[in-house]
């Protein structure tokens, strides 16, 4: 379950990185280049990754038996709102007949997308800590010596 969450976060982060590059290229339409064809693919992967992400995180927290479950659940409610808001913006862009670099630049600048990315960075870091706790103990012990 933690690997799935990590993969979903990575899909959204990769989409954002691709969109940064796409926005800088000055395309008038997604039909102008190979990158243009890819932008819709990245956006569709992000939609798939975001759909149900908060529920998946809540289920993982329950399965992992994490302490302070109420803190996690409160944050997952925030994640759900940010994901839904970002999904609405992404789906609006996907509904357009042409996706220009300017349109993607505006999507990148969306406060909803930025809030979501910050949420995902936080989730990714927490998932990473729970996925590799033994490695951290070993590293911590070797640093103390």
Labelled PLM ranges:
Residues 1-145:
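Surface-exposed peri-terminal alpha-helical interaction modules
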